[in-house]
Amino acid sequence: MKLEQFDFKYMPALVERVYNLWTPPQAEEKFRWIYAESIIRQDMHANNMQFQLTENGQIMAIACASRKGEKNSAGPWWNEQFSKLSDEQKISFNMGREYIAYMDKKTFAFMNENDVKLDMFISTKKGWRKKLLDKAISFFKQAGFENLFLWTDEECNVDWYINHNYELVNEDIYELFSSEEDYKTYVFKMKLE
């Protein structure tokens, strides 16, 4: 099992994994596919921390990370997709982009130059998330990073982070996604010792 740089040939398998979790259920299928892919791409950067684990030619897990202030590499792809959407779809597509940018900026505000941000991790099979995170964390330590940061929201298993040595550094409400209920967001930190 070797930690490798992400190969985009595995993008369809990742989109398929998150399709029902990360997309507006009432939207048409083609838009949902593009929307899910846009979330993944907006968490990728042009650096050496876009990791994958594969087994027998299949993607098992990916993790993408960035340094403080790094911008994602989705721009050209995102703009091309955006230009093909209806006006209503553009609003939804842009809301997703703005949310990710907002949470990235918020997380960067807690970071120093020797910290790393885990932008995303996806596993396609049970047990592979831990395998990948262990390898990625080892890489981050060897690279000299001091702390690992990540953000998440109420749609994820927030208790998992608390139970795995992550410190909650910020809990907030994202007003644009709130209705009768507040939409909660979280920023976590883990010391890389």
Where are these regions (language model features)?
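A short beta-loop-alpha structural element at the N-terminal edge
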Residues: 1-16, 28
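Active-site rim helix/loop that mediates acceptor-substrate recognition in acyltransferases
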Residues: 27-56, 64-70
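Short hydrophobic/aromatic beta-strand element in the GNAT-like acyltransferase core
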Residues: 48-52, 62, 120, 185-187
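Conserved acyl-donor/pantetheine-binding loop and adjacent beta-alpha core of acyl/acetyltransferases
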Residues: 64-120, 176-181
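Conserved GNAT acetyl-CoA-binding A-motif
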Residues: 112-117, 140-153
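Conserved beta-strand-loop-alpha-helix junction that forms the acyl-donor binding cleft
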Residues: 118-125, 149-159, 174-179
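Conserved acetyl-CoA-binding loop-helix of GNAT-fold acetyltransferases
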Residues: 124-140, 163
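Conserved acetyl-CoA-binding loop of GNAT-fold acetyltransferases
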Residues: 162-171
